[in-house]
From Swiss-Prot:
Protein name, UniProt field: Ferredoxin--NADP reductase
Subunit structure: Homodimer.
Entry's EC annotation: 1.18.1.2
Family: Belongs to the ferredoxin--NADP reductase type 2 family.
Keywords linked to the UniProt accession: FAD, Flavoprotein, NADP, Oxidoreductase
Source organism of this protein record: Lactobacillus helveticus (strain DPC 4571)
MF (Gene Ontology): ferredoxin-NADP+ reductase activity; flavin adenine dinucleotide binding; NADP binding
Top enzyme category: oxidoreductase
Coiled-coil segments on the chain, per record: none
Catalytic activity: 2 reduced [2Fe-2S]-[ferredoxin] + NADP(+) + H(+) = 2 oxidized [2Fe-2S]-[ferredoxin] + NADPH
InterPro entries: FAD/NAD-bd_sf, FAD/NAD-binding_dom, Fd--NADP_Rdtase_type_2, Ferredoxin-NADP_redctase_2
Amino acid sequence: MIGAGPVGLFAAHFAHLHGLSSLIFDSLSEVGGQPQMLYPFKKISDIPAYNSINGTALIQNLKSGLPKETEIITNHKVNDIKKNADGFVLDNVVLAKSIIIATGAGAFKPKELPLKMRDEIQKRVHYFIKDPKDFANQKIGVFGGGNSALDLAIELANYANVKIIHRRNEFRGLELNVKKLRSLTNVEILTPYLPKDIQLINNQLDITLKGMGDVQSRHEQFDQIVVAYGFKADNRFIKNWGIELNGTNIAVDPTMKTNIDGIYAAGDVVSYPGRVPLIALGFGEAQIAITSIMRDLFPEKTLTIHSTSI
């Protein structure tokens, strides 16, 4: 498996049900993909059997379904895939009979605050939040205007005083979240402003906010800031493996097979007509891919497709 997000983890679990062993690679420092790295505490409401579940709990549950012998290699970006008579060789080291690519939106990194900062300032500028409680009883600035910024501001407001700064008067996120923010007494909305300068003064971040249009500039002081300008995602490296892309996504057939026999894909990395980017859909695609692999590797076997077979 290439990708240790929710779809890659579930693919390894489903492979185990069919007697297949898996090795999982991920370029990130820890398992879980975007749910773990980008919104670990956000409630996800479109996973079957859960009214809601946060990203961390979802990943923990998926990890608990893996057999003990499943090996996961993090901090490793697969650079090379070669096909031979026995299957595939990844980075001239690992031999695999088949491959499932489940890299989601691809390798991603945050869009950074476009200001020059000294090291002692950068330590107080965050692009990922693991635990909102770490910001308890502090003055926090949140920069951004999309759903991620709104979600972060709402969650942080449970523990801290928050000011959310956006360059437009209108937010791009859900109106329900905007109304929620406006109802909180410890949240202040500052629009339309852009950050112009940042300094560390009296152990606080002193930020110059440039007013847009005829709005006057102002200074704000924070203990820490959180930047939610979005992320740059890139799947173009997959093309180096000889995989056919549809834009930046992998073109697959109904069995989740790519243009290369033995290489499959599942999750948000794939493209086909009518697809919607849902984790739950990726789980089903992983099951299709594993079932297809079993039929390729063991054509003589009669498969038990699912655990509810009678």
